[in-house]
Amino acid sequence: MLQNTINEFFETLSELLLSIEVTDRNGAALSLDAGAEQTVQMMLETKDASQKVLLAGNGGSSAIVSHVQNDLCKATGVRAMVFTEQPLLTALANDEGYGSVFEWPINMWAEANDLFITVSSSGQSENIVRGLKAAREKGCRVITLSGFNPDNLSRRLGDLNFYVPSNVYAYVETAHTALAHFMTTKAAG
């Protein structure tokens, strides 16, 4: 539940930021610092290998991944792309169904060892999950940011998985944004 005052909101947000859970592909827990460091390392390895960072999210999460793309390209020099260009997104949604809007471009553009990052408050969106499965099949490395339910599907599909223990969009999306800012700023040096 959203708090009544801004101070209460910030106190709850601060507690949540420090409670973010990180797991690896096998579900083993990592510290938040270790997860963030591994993410930054993966971003820099992607740059050094001339690979791509591919990003996907819906709604507010789409805005977050667009911002991450901007920061990776401009500040870090990483080749990064999002799959939210309206003509392609609406064509795929209309012709193939909304569940395909991330899977289809992953199948077209992703290559082995690219890095696929998803941001999803629920971690359950069909199009995100299908994109994650396609990325795994292509041999991509995968990072997920999710919230709401600790057993969400996205969290089972990443090499690194960041989970915000809240079911309030405002907290989950703000935490995802903070994670993204830290990681892209650190990667930029």
Question: PLM features: what roles do these ranges have?
Answer:
Residues M1-G189:
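Conserved N-terminal alpha-helical segment that immediately precedes and caps sugar-phosphate-binding
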